[in-house]
UniProtKB/Swiss-Prot annotation:
Record lineage: Archaea, Methanobacteriati, Methanobacteriota, Stenosarchaea group, Methanomicrobia
Domain of life: Archaea
Pfam families reported for this sequence: UPF0179
Protein name as it appears in the record: UPF0179 protein Mlab_1307
Family: Belongs to the UPF0179 family.
Species of the source: Methanocorpusculum labreanum (strain ATCC 43576 / DSM 4855 / Z)
InterPro entries assigned: UPF0179
Disulfide bond residue pairs: none
Length: 152
């Protein structure tokens, strides 16, 4: 198995534990005058992507955004579970993601638009979990898969 590429960043103390996940939202206005903003907003972090904390460092920082301060952590892009057409659902295949459905009121919307997945983003299908037959709209030929963004 490939070793995960990790990124050093700073997150709120509440999120600073192994396994915690978050979607990077970019800089807040309060970050402009912060002395550790360059680490917090590491150039390798991509807005809208989901990350998982893989290790926590001891250093704690005061933070104008996070109550209780912030800690340095190492993060990696996380695996995302989503629904895609069966025609794209082949293990180890690179795909360009297009959501199956755009109905925000649909019960299955979270599977078609999981946090951290971007439309027209490039992903590798890691695992095909099986058929997805629970589409409230009745769409056929769907699979539930685990994907990871293609490294850039």
């Amino acid at each position: 198995m490939d070793k995960e590429e990790t990124i050093v960043t700073i997150v709120g103390s509440v999120l600073a534990h192994e396994g915690a996940e978050f979607v990077y939202a970019g800089k807040a206005a309060e970050c402009e005058s912060c002395k550790v903003a360059k680490v917090c907003h590491n150039a390798k972090l991509r807005e809208g992507k989901r990350y998982r904390v893989v290790s926590v460092r001891k250093t704690k920082h005061d933070c104008a955004v996070h109550e209780g301060g912030a800690k340095a952590v190492e993060v990696a892009e996380t695996i995302i579970t989503a629904v895609i057409p069966t025609s794209q659902a082949t293990r180890r295949t690179r795909i360009t993601y297009t959501p199956v459905c755009d109905d925000v009121f649909c019960k299955g919307y979270a599977f078609c638009h999981p946090d951290g997945l971007t439309e027209k983003g490039r992903y590798v299908v890691l695992e095909v979990l099986g058929p997805y037959s629970e589409c409230p709209k009745g769409t056929k030929n769907l699979k539930l898969v685990e994907m990871r963004p293609v490294p850039t």
